[in-house]
From Swiss-Prot:
ATP binds at residues 328, 353-356. The keyword Nucleotide-binding applies. Transmembrane segments: none annotated. Monomer. The keyword ATP-binding applies. Its EC number is 2.7.2.3. This is Phosphoglycerate kinase. It comes from the Archaea. The gene is pgk. Coiled coil: none annotated. Pathway: Carbohydrate degradation; glycolysis; pyruvate from D-glyceraldehyde 3-phosphate: step 2/5.
Amino acid sequence: MIRTLDDLEADGTALGVRIDINSPLSSDGLADDARLRAHVDTVEELCRRDARVALLAHQGRPGGDEFSDLERHAERLDELLDAPVEYCDSTFSAEARTRIDELDPGRAVLLENTRFYSEEYMSFEPSAAAETYLVSRLAPALDAYVNDAFATAHRSQPSVVGFPERLPAYAGRVMERELDVLGNIESSPEPRVYVLGGAKVDDSIAVARSVLERGLADSVLTAGIVGNAFLLADGVSLGAASAAVVNERSHEAVKQAGDLLDDFSHRIYMPRDVAVENDAGERVEHDLEDLPASTPAMDIGARTVAAYANILDDAGTAILNGPAGVFEDDRFETGTLELYKSATRAEQSIVGGGDTASALRKLGILEDFDHVSTGGGAALNMLTGETLVGVEALRE
């Protein structure tokens, strides 16, 4: 059993709330605040219920271009929330603990980037995570722990799995919604159609195998680099450029796709045509019979969109992960746009996080879907039936 905010006595309680606000940055702030907006419901509810909220989060990877403090995140949260949000430039120091202790009920403080401390970028067993400096120093200042960061639930890091070893633990509203939808795919309306695209070829093939073997998918539609891997496995000569792109992503993808086709060819659908860039820099669509092409496939073509739309029109549930092409380039956004529009006609439409959500946001159709996951890797892991350590840590 996992306790939720409905089970929490929040009034006056000091809460450590793990959120995921890892966002693209710009020179003057945040380039995208979607992840911050996702947690508004949880944080506002806790503040409205007079909790004293200490927010835990990370930004970027050590040494990366987007590795930074969380001051701009605190400023944006303060703008988004009805409740005031302060910023503390430390995470578990005496100052941080004092700031939590002195918080008035109904207020929040965003503590410093948890990844400023090397322990947070390591994996631990939960019992060992509870002994790290971050958890052992900060936990005594808290009465309970709330994990609302579904996007990090697959990472066995101290701020995810350590606190539940020391404190009563609860799922926030984002976590609760994600588990309710992604954890109950088997009871979603049938037929279930998975649309797998993007560049995470190995992950997508793993999802396809898992849902097909477990009987959760009636059809799997492939696109993007994933679709190209299946075409190559099926003997289609896409051209050296497309093959190189697939091999750069995974040396095993074509073999894995071929093995899956051997087992489930009747349920796996591949592109019928692709779009490439010609010498003039224009979009040109080619049927498979007209390949190979000298330039890499950048999108699916109109024939593929029409064929996939026919399947999606009859879908009870459409589960999408990954774009159909290089949607960032306006010349090659059509396949993703039209394919995803078709998916919204399903009785229930579910979108994985990461690049998929970014594509929908750029194309202006994000709000048309029933559920948009906040997690990329976590959503993929859950779709493959893997256990998420951050979720298991919340179980009583």
